[in-house]
Amino acid sequence: MKKHYPTFPFFLTLVLVGLIAACSPKIQQAPESKFNRVQNIPPDIEKWERDMLAFERQDKEKNPGKRPILFIGSSSIVGWKSLESDFPGKRLLNRGFGGSQTDEVHYYAFRILYPYKPKQVVIYVGDNDIAAGKSSETVYNDLKDLFDDIRYQLPKTKITYISIKPSPSRWHLMDEFTKTNERVKTYLESMGNASYVDVVKPMLMPNGKANPEYFLSDSLHMTPQGYSVWAEALRPHLKGRF
């Protein structure tokens, strides 16, 4: 029987494929998700079920569309009523729920985050964690777990974190806020396709104190002027042009 040997073009093709593979940029492997929803159930998590059901009703009433820029987190996200006017022309979706902490946001990510497959997720959470007595170390680790899980579940989604704000009513916690912010900033810079938005500096007066014009009478939640500061700080970090 006559043997058929590979032709020269065949070998040339193999060589070219090898060269292309060697020269192609390496994509960093996403860390495997270590979050176990069964073993990591936050206390009183059922109190948020009403919010989750409300989000599901909203999705049925109005299709959120494909790959939105998703905002998740605590009451500072919930209260951002000017979101669409601050970022016109963007497909935005707000899925914040007030009073939430990082582990609660992470627990509900399978309902408020992953189903939407956002092109970008903007996160504000951690404030309530520290106010509840958690250390900056604990909050940082919870945030890191959340970031890693997002990267594992949605490797192409940009992760953007808004720093913990300098609320006058929680000024005594600023050292812990600062420690958390600094560690989160460093971690996000190492991730790629992620960004950290500093809202502390623009919310301070020249004397280093929080500007009261940016906060409501409770000295915790923000005024429209406060949200304008946030919008200005966030705008350069959003995907797509304005």
Please give the residue ranges for each predicted region.
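Extracellular glycan-modifying ectodomains
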Residues: K62-P64, R111, N128, K144, ...
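Catalytic His-Asp segment of secreted/periplasmic serine-dependent ester chemistry enzymes
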Residues: P168-F242
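Charged helix-capping and loop-helix junction motifs
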Residues: E137-K144, E176-N181
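N-terminal secretory targeting modules
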Residues: M1-I69, K81, S85, R241-F242
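Conserved beta-strand elements of the Class I
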Residues: L70-I72, L93
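Cell-envelope and extracellular/periplasmic
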Residues: G96-G98, I123-I130, K134, K144, ...
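Acidic/histidine-rich helix-loop elements
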Residues: Q39-D44, L92-E104, A131, S219
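Oxyanion-hole/transition-state-stabilizing segment in secreted/luminal serine hydrolases
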Residues: I77-R91, D103-N141, T160, I164-P168
